[in-house]
């Protein structure tokens, strides 16, 4: 198990964890997120769900997690990222789904949208956002 864990962390280019025997309690927030993602990959999951993975992280740890999310996509894994941080979303997403009051109000290709359009959808919902455009 230790060998597989070491190989998985290496395949994700996670270099900030000194030892797989290191206690999770001693890891930074970014390292903990990396371990959580590696655990999903280790069990051959093809979809990884990340709920606010950069919340409460510092700049360096946020960078580490976003880079990891990009590497997952490059390795062919689907990543579902829940975030309120639009700059994080636009950095790593291919497609953006906007939920408002628990309902899907739109799916946007990142290459065909911008932050303003997403904010309008979040604020007003799809129909209102289209009317105000």
Language model feature labels by segment:
Residues 1-133:
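Glycine-rich phosphate-binding loops of nucleotide-dependent enzymes
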């Amino acid at each position: 198990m230790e060998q597989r864990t070491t190989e998985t962390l290496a395949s994700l280019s996670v270099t900030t964890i000194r030892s797989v025997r290191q206690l999770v309690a001693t890891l930074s927030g970014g390292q903990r997120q990396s371990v959580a993602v590696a655990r999903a990959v280790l069990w051959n999951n093809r979809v990884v769900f990340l709920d606010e993975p950069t919340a409460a992280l510092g700049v360096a740890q946020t960078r580490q997690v976003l880079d990891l999310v990009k590497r997952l996509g490059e390795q062919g894994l689907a990543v579902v990222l829940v975030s309120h941080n639009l700059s994080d979303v636009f950095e790593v997403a291919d497609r953006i789904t906007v939920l408002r009051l628990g309902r899907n109000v739109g799916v946007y290709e990142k290459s065909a949208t911008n932050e303003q359009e997403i904010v309008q959808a979040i604020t007003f919902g799809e129909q209102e956002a289209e009317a105000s455009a």
